[in-house]
Regions:
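Nucleic acid-binding interface residues in structured DNA/RNA-binding domains
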Residues: 2-145
């Protein structure tokens, strides 16, 4: 039997028991610190990205701060937050290709330091094009205003 690859939209809808909060284990405390870590659901990250208004941007770390605050945890997982923003971006690209007009504005999410994300649909070029269309200035794959 052939395996049917999931669409990005299906990946976005698959919460896998998330969100959840766990205590950071001693062996990970050197890197993440003491306390608790929230792992968001993919749809939770998508909903946060949808709230970013036209002309505004947010970094993945800013999204993480909102997630941690929402769940009352010390931090939000940087790995899953980044992966879920990537899934959200590709699900939005699928929606756009299907003719939907209102999609998640994935291009408004930046890496730390204002860097564009090469893993988003269309790579850095498409990321820059969409940000420029909203009035932002990009130089060396980085947002400058």
């Amino acid at each position: 039997m052939a395996y049917k690859r999931k669409t990005w939209r299906e990946k976005l809808a698959d919460d896998k028991g998330l969100p959840r909060v766990f205590t950071i284990q001693p062996r990970h405390q050197k890197r993440w610190g003491r306390g608790t870590c929230a792992i968001p659901s993919p749809r939770e990250v998508d909903a946060l990205i949808r709230k970013i208004r036209k002309g505004r941007v947010a970094t993945v770390n800013q999204l993480r701060a909102v997630i941690a605050n929402k769940h009352g945890s010390t931090i939000a997982c940087p790995i899953t937050t980044g992966i879920f923003s990537w899934i959200s971006a590709h699900a939005a690209a699928e929606d756009e290709a299907a003719g939907k007009k209102r999609i998640t504005p994935w291009w408004r999410v930046l890496k730390e330091g204002g860097k564009l994300n090469p893993k988003f649909p269309g790579g850095v070029g498409e990321h820059a094009r969409r940000l420029r269309a909203e009035g932002h200035t990009i130089r060396n794959s980085k947002l400058v205003s």
